[in-house]
Design a protein with these regions (language model features):
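N-terminal [4Fe-4S]-dependent radical SAM core
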Residues: 31-54, 60-116, 131, 342-344
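Short Cys/His-rich "knuckle" micro-motifs
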Residues: 65-68, 135-136, 346-349, 371-373
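Short cysteine-rich clusters marking metal-coordination/redox-active sites
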Residues: 55, 124, 336-339, 361-364
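N-terminal secretory signal peptides and thylakoid transit peptides that target proteins
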Residues: 1-14
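Conserved AdoMet/S-adenosylmethionine-binding subsite of the radical SAM
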Residues: 144-304
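Extended interfacial segments that mediate partner engagement and assembly in macromolecular machines
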Residues: 82-170, 176
Length: 373
């Protein structure tokens, strides 16, 4: 069953598209419901003869005729001009702990104004937000939130950052970019949670206006990406390299799924690659899988598997390796690589202690990389 079919069957079974989503709660209070679709000209595409276009935003390079949409479902060719249909059309808006993203080396203990529009340029069979990521914009309730309004709302709410999250922010590139520009003017940082399927040119443009990027490295084989992500590993690795070489902070998350991507030889290869291509100080999070969407036949990841993955990554020289989605686990903490003491103590999303002084371990003075202020 494809993603559209799954949505249709869910609707037929009486499941609301909003069920199970991150709560809209008070985040959307005061925002007016607008027309479901925007019509703002997209960036990163070329016009072709006969009113065709080719999208250059992500590696799919969708070539589209008049009135056709890209794979993401949120960008449409109308008369030979390509438009984003979700500019300022927010379907999820919350204030989250930054640790939920997860970012562990960015402003610990603070909150991020977290937003999303509909759409995604891959189709992960284990997606936790499939109701909005795999929907077209007409299928979700959206509210108008202009870039300047989003930036002002973050500042007024005491959020030092805006997170582009929940779905795939690449597909609302224009909105994310413009919001990040306005947020920076107000002293609000921008953090991106992405699967990494973006072409080099738009990525370079984005890296000029955001502060941190978390890449979901969903596996370490093309076979896994083809079967379970409907994407490709190669562009994700290229994205990680590019972010690591920029001035933007990088963290990596690996969702470890039993029997699908939990081979320890691949974990070792992945850890070596991260060490060599992104650097030993890039934080890596091995997180626990929960049955979701189209992969409900597998159990949650054993904690012992996550611990083994972390142990291998440390053996290969990575300095900051975490176990995620296991609240209370000791490997949620940040340990100083110099003296071994806990420098950031966490329980779930809560921060119990931060033992840093000007970005250095209070005990031994070892510099700890990250965005601390």
């Amino acid at each position: 069953m494809n993603r559209r079919g799954f949505l249709r069957s869910a609707a037929g079974a009486g499941l609301a598209l909003g069920a199970g989503l991150p709560s809209l709660g008070a985040g959307l209070a005061g925002l007016g419901a607008g027309p479901n679709l925007s019509r703002v000209e997209a960036r990163h595409y070329v016009k072709l003869p006969d009113r065709e276009i080719e999208c250059r935003l992500c590696p799919r390079l969708c070539r589209l005729g008049d009135k056709e949409r890209g794979y993401c479902g949120v960008r449409e060719n109308i008369g030979g001009t390509y438009y984003t249909l979700v500019y300022g059309k927010v379907c999820s808006l919350n204030i989250d702990p930054i640790e939920k993203k997860p970012f562990f080396h960015v402003l610990p203990g603070t909150s991020a104004l977290s937003l999303a529009t509909a759409g995604c340029n891959v189709n992960c069979k284990f997606c936790q937000n499939w109701e909005i990521s795999q929907a077209r914009p007409e299928q979700v309730e959206a509210f108008d939130l202009a870039p300047e309004t989003a930036a002002a709302r973050a500042a007024a709410s005491g959020c030092p950052s805006i997170a582009y999250t929940y779905t795939e922010p690449t597909v609302y590139f224009e909105y994310m970019y413009d919001t990040a520009v306005r947020a920076r003017r107000r002293g609000v940082r921008s953090i991106v949670v992405t699967g990494g399927h973006i072409n080099p040119e738009p990525l370079a443009e984005l890296l000029g206006v955001v502060d941190a990027v978390k890449v979901d490295l969903k596996g370490f084989s093309e076979e896994f990406y083809t079967e379970y992500v409907r994407g490709s590993l190669k562009p994700v690795l290229e994205t990680i390299r590019a972010v690591a070489r920029s001035k933007v902070w990088l963290e990596i998350v690996v969702l470890v799924i039993p029997t699908l991507n939990d081979r320890m030889d691949l974990i070792r290869d992945m850890s070596r690659w991260i060490r060599d291509e992104a650097g030993k100080e890039v934080p890596v999070h091995f997180t626990r899988f929960q049955p979701m969407y189209l992969v409900k036949n597998l159990p949650p990841t054993p904690v012992s598997t996550l611990e083994a993955a972390r142990r291998i990554a440390l053996e290969e020289g990575l300095r900051y390796v975490y176990v995620g989605n296991v609240p209370g686990h000791e490997s949620e903490n940040t340990y100083c690589p110099g003296c071994g003491k806990v420098i950031i103590a966490r329980v779930g999303y809560a921060i119990e202690a931060v033992r840093l002084k000007k970005g250095k371990c209070e005990s031994c003075g070892t510099p700890i990389p990250g965005i601390w202020a």
